[in-house]
Amino acid sequence: SLHRGIKPLLKHADLRIHDGQKLALIGPNGAGKSSLFALLLGELGVEEGDLYLPTGWRVAHMAQEVEASDRCAVDYVIDGDKTYREIEHGIETATCDNELANWHSKMDAHNGYNIKVQAEQLLHGLGFKQSDMVKPVSGFSGGWRIRLNLAQALMTPSDLLLLDEPTNHLDLDATLWLEQWLNKYQGTLVFISHDRDFIDGVADHIVHLHQQTLTSYPGNYSAYERIRAERLAQQQVMHDKQQVRIAEIEKFVTR
């Protein structure tokens, strides 16, 4: 169970996410989708029940805001890889040859010597020009800063990736590129989106947050619509049968 203030968002909800799933979280605005993300990030705690993540799982997420800074775009994206930054700092502060060799060995194992190329590839895919690579974060508009946050999240080594409306500030080319990137992503993906085509192209499971419950559907958005329509039709048939039965009982009682 989860509340925001006195408002219940989830009540006796159950959700199991399996390794490697690509799960789209859908539901009306205000239903609690972003709060569920905050729960997975440890920013909120459950009032009742348990939340379990595998030990050692690395969780990456797309921040919704970014402060203006003089840090250039490519460095901002690389900052998402904290392990790389730790190794880089170790190399810069090493005090002897053995220590330096050890840090360089870690850098090689981390594939850190190619990290700038990786960061630039992410930025190019999301629509940035080559001249943007050295442009300070403060030089970009709000929408482009959100793209920087997205690139930084993709740069972060992760087992679980959380993306909240990742296509909101993307044009079609960038959206299609992101779709391809996420299809190749090896970890577990949970994302929020109102873009049905994007959900269809990425998700293999849909979780519908509705009336404080979570309902899981296999497949993409098109499959979800079909399955949900079938379930609603079955529920209507059951309801109609119940009404007929109630009417029969009432008729019998009034005899």
Please tell me what each predicted stretch does:
Residues S1-K241:
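ABC ATP-binding cassette signature C-motif
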Residues D240-R255:
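Short cytosolic helices in intracellular loops of multi-pass membrane proteins
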